[in-house]
Amino acid sequence: MPSRSKRVLLYSHDSFGLGHVSRCRTIANAIVGADHSVSVLIVSGSPVVGSYEFRSGVDFVRIPGVVKQISGEYDSANLRTNIEHTLEMRTRIIRDTADIYRPDLFIVDKEPLGLRGEVGPALHLLKERGTPLVLGLRDVMDDPTQLAKEWERKNVVPALRDLYDEIWVYGLPQINKPLTGIEVPPSVRHKMVYTGYLRRELPLHTDVPHEGEEMQGPYILVTPGGGGDGEDLVDWVLSAYEHDGNIPYGAVIVFGPFMSATAREAFKERAAKFPNIRTLTFTNNLGVLMQRAAGVVAMGGYNTFCEILSFDKKAIIVPRTRPRLEQFIRARAARNVGLIEMLDADRGRDPQAMATALRQLPQQGIPSDVVVPGLLDGLGSVWRLVSKQLAHPHRGPASLEVPDAPEAAAEDPDATSPSRART
């Protein structure tokens, strides 16, 4: 029987914002870029997953979408069905996809059991087949007290102990340890590997959004990520320009696809009064705008933080603190290391405070001024971890097809190895 190419399945948690699908897309593109014989299939309910550019060898299964309200409650995104019915459909599609696709490796992003446990049946199916199971975590999850309560409610620790073979943390322990303060057995901590942050690169051929081309001089990129909770950030920046006429740079504001139409229109009217401010709702070429920018003002989600590091940009981070402290913890840690500056909106959104920060941006340092070994080694580390898993045959019942003979993965001799956690 002929051999088949290796297959990776990625589950992308998708209930709020762009972060999860963007991270999975970056990882998928890196995997197939490192080995053209590998295929990667992403399972996601993100409404914008089809807007991203994927390399040959990557495809996605779009499951019915859900949205997470600011209150923390979930609802169906588009279907006129209750959330329980939507989750039942998602659960079956995820399991059936895993069953038919027969991956050689399953990587779950962020949520160990998926949204409301929807990945559980697929995990158990693949575990019985001996498929390696990996949980990918961002550098910061949440305040330890809140995360501990959430994981206890979701019964996460048994899954970490009994189902997953490895836990990859897409960050560095010297910046943050996501499970600090969480009671997990030593066997779980032994599974943790710190990869470094995931470097972002621009495609070889990419168009510059015309809003960026229209700028006559240096500009600040303002990005609240998906935009669903970014209105306060955009309002604060516009208030600074309205308050202070001496800000040295113009601005390109990307609202994000999930910002309400009412808020976008109100912001557009305010921005139109300034000849050096441009606005747009969404672009899948945000990296191009960031590369050309003199600096960045952002909320500091994981992916935006990786882009700031990758393009070596001066940045002012205004983290949200509700419903999670993730962005605040990341921004505080990065500021303490010297990678970025931070403004705390909970202390009041004084227009003068933002204006002062924007005026001081030209004198601010760039991330590369600080030497952090292995800071952006994430993608290389992930590929070495993936290739290691793919090199081993399934440990359980054989699949319907015979897997390829293991191939040695080409490694960069100068690359930093992933860091395995011991604490």
What is the role of each PLM region?
Residues 12-25, 48-49, 230-232:
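A short, glycine/small-residue-rich beta-strand->loop->alpha-helix junction that serves as a flexible
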Residues 28, 199-295, 347:
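Donor-nucleotide binding loops and adjacent catalytic segments primarily
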Residues 94-116:
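Short N-terminal targeting/anchoring amphipathic segment
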Residues 5-7, 12, 30-85, 89, ...:
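Conserved nucleotide-sugar phosphate-binding/catalytic loop shared by glycosyltransferases and other
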Residues 285-329:
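A donor-sugar binding/catalytic signature common to diverse glycosyltransferases
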Residues 352-423:
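C-terminal amphipathic helix plus adjacent low-complexity
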Residues 137-232, 258-261:
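A nucleotide-sugar donor-handling region in carbohydrate enzymes
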